[in-house]
């Protein structure tokens, strides 16, 4: 019993819920925890949409989100979005926990600046699996599925199923 309790304390969401329920006598949702961290404690406070409190978003002015994408960011923890060159995400795209979206690399001659390049474009209704990495300049068509842990380094057309490091298309979805 003690070991299980200690394991739960290692996960911040569960730890916050246990503390609030046990000592304050209230139950709390993930949405409320995100609100407290983002709006009151100002972690990712400059972002207009809700983000999970364990995620980090940089360059918020360069992000364009489609319809319902913010819900996935609010529920998927541990995500990292660096949008130096811009990130455009289509409607109803879903992200797993730990997804990394990196839109710019450092200039090799000056490590304090980013290389200018095209934005990352992710189509509508895509699924991005847990711990997947999407690198600068990538374009994913609509209805793509990126497997867990895949590293996407190049463009893929619509309805591609991507896996591996570097990601490769293993098949097309059948609608």
Label the predicted regions.
Residues 97, 102-118, 124, 130-175:
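Glycine-rich hexapeptide-repeat left-handed beta-helix
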Residues 1-103, 108, 124, 175:
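Domain-scale signature associated with acetyltransferase and cell-envelope carbohydrate enzymes
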């Amino acid at each position: 019993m003690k070991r299980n309790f200690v394991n739960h304390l290692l996960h911040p969401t569960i730890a916050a819920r246990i503390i609030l329920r046990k000592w304050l006598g209230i139950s709390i949702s993930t949405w409320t925890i995100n609100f407290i961290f983002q709006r009151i404690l100002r972690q990712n406070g400059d972002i207009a949409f809700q983000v999970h409190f364990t995620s980090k978003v940089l360059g918020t002015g360069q992000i364009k989100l489609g319809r319902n994408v913010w819900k996935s960011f609010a529920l998927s923890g541990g995500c990292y979005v660096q949008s130096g060159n811009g990130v455009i995400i289509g409607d109803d795209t879903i992200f797993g926990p730990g997804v990394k979206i990196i839109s710019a690399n450092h200039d090799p001659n000056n490590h304090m600046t980013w290389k200018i390049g095209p934005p990352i474009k992710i189509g509508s209704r895509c699924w991005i699996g847990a711990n997947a990495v999407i690198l600068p300049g990538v374009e994913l068509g609509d209805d793509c599925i990126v497997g867990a842990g895949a590293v996407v380094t190049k463009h893929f057309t619509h309805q591609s199923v991507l896996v591996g490091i570097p990601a490769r298309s293993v098949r097309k979805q059948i609608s």
